[in-house]
């Protein structure tokens, strides 16, 4: 799989997260669950009165730092969730470009090879199904470490 094809997969997931018609999609449900349960995303984001470009760059740098040492499906879902949360703060006229840029950061961070070697989109869906059972507290067991790691890295970026 080429990195461009992988980026397109990520971009399509982010687009589905912005569109309410895909609420039965397990990846979209997992992303929305993380955003809903961790409204702290908004509180930890920098002052987004900054231009859209700076928002995307900040988010992208945080994404790249998230998988610096290891990658797992929890971190991938956390990156998708954080990106979707940021996209909610962006005006409609910039969303297409922002979605493309964020998907580029995620695809660079995760890597097409890692994605394929770990089962691709099918495994991502299976992971999301496994963390989205009837008991919503199971989501916490898988995503809290990944989300918190991403947020700590963001705070580190803010300090620099």
Swiss-Prot record:
Q: Which domain of life is it from?
A: Viruses
Q: Which UniProt keywords apply?
A: Apoptosis, Host-virus interaction, Inhibition of host apoptosis by viral BCL2-like protein, Modulation of host cell apoptosis by virus
- Which SUPFAM superfamilies would you find in this protein's record? Bcl-2 inhibitors of programmed cell death (SSF56854)
What residue intervals hold the motif BH1?
64-84
Coiled-coil portions = none
Q: Name one GO biological process term.
A: regulation of apoptotic process
Which InterPro entries does the record associate with it? Bcl-2-like_sf, Bcl-2_BH1-3, Bcl2-like, Bcl2_BH1_motif_CS
Q: List the disulfide bonds.
A: none
Hey, which family's this protein in?
Belongs to the Bcl-2 family.
Which protein is depicted?
Bcl-2-like gene 16 protein
Report the source organism: Saimiriine herpesvirus 2 (strain 11) (SaHV-2)
